[in-house]
Amino acid sequence: MLDVKMMRQNFDEVKAKLQTRGVKEEILVEFLRLDESRRDLLVKVEEMKKYRNDVSAEIAQLKRNKEDATAKIAEMKEVGGNIKALDAEINAIDEELRGITTTLPNLPDDSVPVGAGEEENVEVRRWSEPRTFAFEPKPHWEVAENLGILDFERGAKVAGSRFVYYKGLGARLERALYNFMLDLHVYEHGYTEMITPYIVNDTAMFGTGQFPKFKEDVFQLQDTDLTLIPTAEVPLTNYYNNEILDGKDLPIYFTALSPSFRSEAGSAGRDTRGLIRLHQFNKVEMVKFSDAEHSYEELEKMTNNAEEILQKLGLPYRVMALSTGDMGFSAAKTYDLEVWIPAQETYREISSCSNCEDFQARRAMIRYRDENDKVQYAHTLNGSGLAVGRTVAAILENYQNEDGSVTVPEVLVPYMGNLTVIK
């Protein structure tokens, strides 16, 4: 959530930045009008309360002097009613302001490319050249079904479209991948491994910015305020909800494997086959808590942590700086890692690493006490390290052989019981 005082004092700059994120000018003008009305009403209320206090003292004096205070008492009843009415008006404006401020996205950092969508994303760097095949590479779902390691048909029978069974060496490959990812993050990158709740309340979903704006994107438990997590970012970030940390403990690194549940509202007709877009998938998440001074340094480190996984797996990828119109709601800056998918002859997102600055911390009240004993909002960061199913897809396509087998990436061989080929 944005700082209302900052919005008021820097309105033109805030308006210009939010418009690059698709926010309509009339919404921001309405915010300013409501904010001014609220401040005017607060001044009136304070003046009335001061007048009431002064007259109350006069009434007390009149009573001590055994003089008639009836008129002033009647006047104070009227003033009290006026104060109550103004308070109600202020509360109504507060609700309107909250309806606006809770749905405004974060301000983009000055380094973020300005643009309406993914077409304006900027490539930062690439790693490795895509493999040249001596045969036409098959899509991963075809490779997997021929090997009998993924079953989309029975997944659909049991749960509907966009669900899958991992089977045999397919399940082993998925498990090998997330164990490899967690080991790298914990033992080499310095993250603390967590196992989180997979169901969270509305407060947690609000804290990370999914609610109230994106309720249609998740699976909610009927007749409760509980939701299946769309990402482990939600329980990991909210671990410190409404807490004050010791600044000396920052930065704090968390990582967790969890299923992610997405309704994929608005994705009809997109990626209807394969592992790219499912309602349920495993993901290893990275979350950081930082001070303001070092959060962008931590973003670069987090992005490098995700890149190292792809490099060790030998998967070609590129890093994209997302434009203002393509970033997620809570992000101030985002890098996407896109892995090469041979059958589609294109790069597809496999990780997204974001600095949310103090946007989530304001919503979740995550603070720290600095060296001067002043309480500050923390900066929060999150990133995929990596989406496991999409990594399986990338391996099946990039490491497929002409005979239909799949070579196991060298770094995964120990995790696969020294198996070198899936066939």
UniProtKB/Swiss-Prot annotation:
A molecular function (GO) term: transferase activity
InterPro entries: aa-tRNA-synt_IIb (IPR002314), aa-tRNA-synth_II (IPR006195), aa-tRNA-synth_II/BPL/LPL (IPR045864), Ser-tRNA-ligase_type_1 (IPR002317), Ser-tRNA-synth_1_N (IPR015866), SerRS_1_N_sf (IPR042103), SerRS_core (IPR033729), tRNA-bd_arm (IPR010978)
Domain of life, per lineage: Bacteria
Pfam families: Seryl_tRNA_N, tRNA-synt_2b
Residues bound to ATP: 262-264, 349-352
Localization per Swiss-Prot or TrEMBL: Cytoplasm
Note on domains (UniProt): Consists of two distinct domains, a catalytic core and a N-terminal extension that is involved in tRNA binding.
Function: Catalyzes the attachment of serine to tRNA(Ser). Is also able to aminoacylate tRNA(Sec) with serine, to form the misacylated tRNA L-seryl-tRNA(Sec), which will be further converted into selenocysteinyl-tRNA(Sec).
PROSITE patterns found in the cross-reference section: AA_TRNA_LIGASE_II
Family: Belongs to the class-II aminoacyl-tRNA synthetase family. Type-1 seryl-tRNA synthetase subfamily.
PANTHER family referenced in this protein's UniProt entry, alphabetically: SERINE--TRNA LIGASE, SERYL-TRNA SYNTHETASE
Subunit structure: Homodimer. The tRNA molecule binds across the dimer.
GO CC, any one term: cytoplasm
An annotated GO BP: selenocysteine biosynthetic process
Reactions performed catalytically: tRNA(Ser) + L-serine + ATP = L-seryl-tRNA(Ser) + AMP + diphosphate + H(+); tRNA(Sec) + L-serine + ATP = L-seryl-tRNA(Sec) + AMP + diphosphate + H(+)
Enzyme Commission number: 6.1.1.11
Pathway(s) where this gene product acts: Aminoacyl-tRNA biosynthesis; selenocysteinyl-tRNA(Sec) biosynthesis; L-seryl-tRNA(Sec) from L-serine and tRNA(Sec): step 1/1
NCBIfam families per UniProt: serS (TIGR00414)
Residues annotated for L-serine binding in this entry: 231-233, 285, 384
Name by which UniProt lists this protein: Serine--tRNA ligase 2
Record's keyword annotation contains Aminoacyl-tRNA synthetase: yes
Keywords, in A-Z order: Aminoacyl-tRNA synthetase, ATP-binding, Cytoplasm, Ligase, Nucleotide-binding, Protein biosynthesis
Listed Gene3D superfamilies: Bira Bifunctional Protein, Domain 2, Serine-tRNA synthetase, tRNA binding domain
Residue stretches spanning the membrane: none
Species name: Enterococcus faecalis (strain ATCC 700802 / V583)
